[in-house]
Amino acid sequence: MLDKIIRIATRQSPLALWQAHYVQHLLQANHPGLQIELVPMVTRGDIILDTPLAKVGGKGLFVKELELALLDGRADIAVHSMKDVPIAFPEGLGLVAICEREDPRDAFVSSHYAHLDDLPAGSVVGTSSLRRQCQLRERRPDLIIRDLRGNVGTRLAKLDNGDYQAIILAVAGLKRLGLETRIRYAMSAEESLPAVGQGAVGIECRLDDDHTRQLLAPLNHRHTELRVCAERAMNIRLEGGCQVPIGSYAELEGDTLWLRALVGAPDGSQMIRGERRGPAAEAEQMGIELADELLSRGAREILAAVYLDNPAR
């Protein structure tokens, strides 16, 4: 059935298009002769650029329109950054493949400073991520953290124009766009714990579309799937969204999974951290247990306050 054209729903940003072309390349490498076309779309998250992401709220800020295209038959698969994928899917849709993960770390980007610790007091650092903001404020309460929206090119332009002394971006996005020279250094997980699924590309489709699911099966990277499964299980238990001060990062060491997580107050005044080590086969259960530990230690109250401040979530 290679005569059927597979339509990929994707956002129109340069990074999203890179991801869609990446999936196209993988599909055609595994299935020579397969015809593929891209269906570029604009999401709500792409349109509303003058408001912090946490204030815009809404589940699926960057994926809802793509999912609608799957449901009404305009597309066969949707390609997402895993960190943007909500904790629940519309009925009939699901995540069927997670590609091999790129570097999941955050990148410190600055025109004049080599390291976060080199920034003078009062320096302005740009990021709209509450996860990044709370960790920055804990480490450097003397900095001014300001929201920063737009695609990667827009954010770099604002840095270059002098609006910020530094900005925090994802290493994976910069590398994929050929902009790795802009990275001053990749921040360790101890310094900035990554977002759930950061650096991984996920593929969603209709669950009853057996043909497309068979085509996608070779694209799933088992090690990445286990790591992201643990991270997402933790996030689901916390009822976290994409725009909350939650970090989670799993590493595989042989058959052992090491899962770290944090929930932080946006002002950096409270940070609840935890970790688990166990068999990789128990990735999901580890995520649930770690979330329960964080909730019992005060994460519930922190998240309740965040949701009260950002009711649109």
Swiss-Prot record:
E.C. designation(s): 2.5.1.61
Record's cofactor remark: Binds 1 dipyrromethane group covalently.
GO MF, one annotated term: hydroxymethylbilane synthase activity
InterPro entries in UniProt: HemC, Porphobilin_deaminase_cofac_BS, Porphobilin_deaminase_N, Porphobilinogen_deaminase_C, Porphobilinogen_deaminase_C_sf
Positions bearing S-(dipyrrolylmethanemethyl)cysteine: 242
Signal peptide (from-to): none
A cellular-component GO term for this protein: cytoplasm
Top-rank taxon, per record: Bacteria
Pfam families linked: Porphobil_deam, Porphobil_deamC
Named cofactor requirement(s): dipyrromethane
Pathway: Porphyrin-containing compound metabolism; protoporphyrin-IX biosynthesis; coproporphyrinogen-III from 5-aminolevulinate: step 2/4
Keyword Transferase assigned: yes
Catalysed conversion reaction: 4 porphobilinogen + H2O = hydroxymethylbilane + 4 NH4(+)
GO BP: any one term: protoporphyrinogen IX biosynthetic process
Note: The porphobilinogen subunits are added to the dipyrromethane group.
Family affiliation: Belongs to the HMBS family.
General function of this protein: Tetrapolymerization of the monopyrrole PBG into the hydroxymethylbilane pre-uroporphyrinogen in several discrete steps.
Quaternary structure note: Monomer.
Protein name: Porphobilinogen deaminase
Species annotation: Yersinia pseudotuberculosis serotype IB (strain PB1/+)
